[in-house]
Regions:
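Hydrophobic ligand-binding cavity/cleft-lining segments
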Residues: 1-46
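Residue-level preference for beta-strand/loop junctions
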Residues: 2, 47, 62, 93, ...
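Hydrophobic/aromatic beta-strand elements that line small-molecule binding cavities or substrate pockets
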Residues: 6-8, 65-72, 95-105
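A short, structured loop/turn motif at beta-sheet edges
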Residues: 14, 43-45, 71-78, 100-112, ...
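Structural signal for hydrophobic/aromatic residues that build the beta-strand cores
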Residues: 17, 51, 70, 81, ...
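Glycine-rich portal/gate segments that line the openings of hydrophobic small-molecule binding cavities
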Residues: 25-29, 38-90
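Short, highly charged C-terminal tails/helix-capping segments
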Residues: 34-35, 141-150
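Beta-strand/loop substructures that line and gate deep hydrophobic ligand-binding cavities in soluble
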Residues: 80-138
Length: 150
């Protein structure tokens, strides 16, 4: 299985970033250019829940939507999804993503937001999901600006 990851430092406590990420109403307002809507189709965010992400115009040339099944939740810290439908599922099988929010040592008002993907390309010519990584990191960076209005 191949892996790719990236991270950004956020100027907020990990708990706040976690709450923003897990709340469909809030996450849909953070950066509609990248993520226009999120809904739990089944469940409430626990393992086994299905969450549908509708992507915004900033990434719709690459991915329009992604249906994800929550596999693992470490409360307040990380959530792991397996993509079970949408454009990414056609390019990679499996495609598993983990979003983590980790407090920085010595400063409880900052955290490290990490995106990690584990994947297998569906075809030999399929490139690594660099566009997905870049979009996810841009989205995570948007948390800082949004929190000022939240």
């Amino acid at each position: 299985m191949k892996m790719m990851k990236g991270q950004v430092v956020l100027n907020m406590p990990a708990e706040k970033a976690w709450e923003m990420y897990r709340n469909n109403e809030i996450i849909s307002k953070i950066n509609p250019e990248l993520l226009s809507r999120a809904d739990y189709i089944q469940g409430d965010g626990a393992p086994g829940s299905l969450r549908l992400f509708k992507l915004g115009p900033g990434v719709s040339n690459y991915v329009k939507e992604s249906m994800e099944k929550i596999e693992k939740v470490v409360s307040g810290r990380s959530v792991t999804y397996e993509v079970i439908g949408g454009d990414l599922k056609e390019m990679y099988d499996p495609y598993r993503v983990t979003f983590s929010f980790v407090p920085t040592q010595g400063n409880s008002n900052k955290c490290i937001a990490e995106w990690k993907a584990e994947f297998e390309p569906s075809a030999p010519a399929t490139p690594p999901p660099e566009q997905a990584r870049d979009a996810a990191l841009r989205f995570l960076e948007s948390f800082d600006n949004f929190q000022l209005s939240y």
